[in-house]
């Protein structure tokens, strides 16, 4: 055989075990069962373990170098040990204050404010450093792709483009129990008959657990392009790390080519500048993602996972402008701005054809109820982010 078969088992992207497979002399259509002994692996709390098999060329050939990756596959192993739970009562004390403008939470070295006007987290700072620049907002739109334009998505789903900014706060409730502040905010967009319930839990270490639940009452509405949140981050937060699929962009219906692992890079490099500006840079099955400036940062830990992207420009720069000459290489440039999109999902990109076909129905966010959760964890430069991601508060 002109191929070599290797395997590796990783936990938190650290090699636990590895080896080579013998020659697999199989005819087309034949199969063979491989057995891996996992008894020597001692799982650590909260760590996922993956087996990755790679097939590479053994010899150099015309047009194909030696060691060229021909095929690979990844398997999540049935090895898991639950993370250690931290009791919120063991953390530093926090205080909750209510006023006409909303609810304010103060703890040791941090502050979180939830305003009636925005209906979301509006201020979040640690040691005097703002971790978000403006109030969070519900984000239900995506910049149309070429496939979207071909199937009329901008017109069909126009109802959702500004649904997040149209929402009005109906209820804002705050309470303090077991050294945990709970804030429940109910927002309503009457035009789309949509209710968004946001539940925040704030802890004494500055972590904030976020749960977003959306309910669409009218079943006749078009699919929703995306369900998520958008955060305007400090412009100095130009470094991103994540544990999820990568390193390239991936989507709900386009993700099996992206392996789960630990990746890092600049925020700017996560965008691909297509000739016509459009949706770009999405990552799927994210266990955690962190933005930082090297000195301080913010992690979003999925509960259990989320999709998302980061952009060194306003995400709206990618939006379609009919009859415009906007060019991705010329007009999409890095700015003094970082947008962080943390999503439940966005609809698939489709591609059966580009002149009318929508994404398959099971990759659409049709009128229904959807919810997802994640937890913000502030950190300082140099912290072990894999270790930090194992924090579990209950």
Give the predicted meaning of each segment.
Residues 11, 25, 37-46, 61, ...:
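Beta-strand/loop-rich accessory regions of lumenal/periplasmic or secreted enzymes
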Residues 16, 65-72, 131:
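Local beta-strand/beta-hairpin segments that build beta-sheet-rich folds
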Residues 5-64:
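Intrinsically disordered, low-complexity Pro/Gly/Ser/Thr-rich segments with frequent PxxP/GP/PP motifs
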Residues 2-3, 9-21, 69, 192-194, ...:
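Short beta-strand and strand-turn-strand segments in soluble, beta-rich domains
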């Amino acid at each position: 055989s002109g191929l070599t078969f290797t395997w590796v088992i990783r936990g938190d992207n650290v090699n636990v075990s590895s080896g080579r497979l013998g020659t697999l002399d199989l005819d087309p259509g034949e199969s063979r069962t491989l057995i891996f002994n996992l008894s020597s692996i001692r799982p650590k709390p909260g760590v996922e373990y993956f087996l990755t098999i790679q097939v590479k060329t053994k010899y150099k050939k015309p047009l194909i170098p030696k060691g060229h990756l021909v095929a690979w596959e990844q398997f999540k192993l049935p090895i898991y040990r639950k993370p250690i739970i931290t009791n919120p009562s063991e953390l530093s004390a926090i205080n909750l204050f209510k006023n006409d403008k909303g609810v304010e939470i103060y703890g040791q070295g941090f502050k979180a404010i939830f305003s009636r006007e925005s209906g979301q987290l509006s201020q979040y700072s640690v040691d005097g450093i703002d971790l978000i620049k403006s109030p969070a907002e519900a984000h239900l739109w995506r910049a149309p792709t070429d496939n979207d334009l071909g199937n009329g998505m901008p017109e069909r789903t126009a109802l959702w483009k500004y649904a997040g900014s149209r929402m009005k706060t109906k209820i804002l409730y705050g309470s303090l129990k077991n050294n945990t502040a709970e804030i429940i905010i109910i927002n309503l967009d009457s035009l789309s008959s949509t209710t968004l319930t946001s539940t925040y839990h704030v802890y004494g270490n500055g972590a904030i657990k976020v749960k977003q639940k959306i309910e669409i009452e009218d079943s006749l509405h078009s699919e929703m392009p995306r369900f998520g949140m958008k955060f305007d981050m400090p412009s100095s937060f130009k470094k991103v790390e994540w544990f999820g699929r990568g390193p390239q962009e991936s989507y709900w219906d386009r993700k099996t080519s992206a392996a789960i692992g630990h990746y890092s890079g600049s925020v700017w490099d996560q965008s691909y500048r297509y000739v016509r500006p459009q949706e770009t840079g999405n990552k799927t099955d994210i266990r955690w993602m962190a933005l930082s400036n090297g000195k301080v940062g913010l992690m979003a830990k999925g509960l259990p996972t989320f999709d998302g992207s980061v952009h060194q420009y306003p995400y709206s720069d990618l939006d379609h402008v009919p009859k415009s000459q906007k060019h991705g290489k010329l007009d999409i440039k890095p700015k003094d701005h970082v947008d962080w999109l943390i999503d439940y999902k966005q609809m698939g990109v489709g591609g059966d054809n580009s002149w009318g076909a929508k994404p398959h129905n099971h990759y659409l966010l049709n009128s229904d109820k959807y919810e997802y959760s994640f937890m913000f964890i502030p950190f300082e430069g140099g912290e072990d982010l894999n270790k930090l991601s194992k924090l579990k508060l209950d």
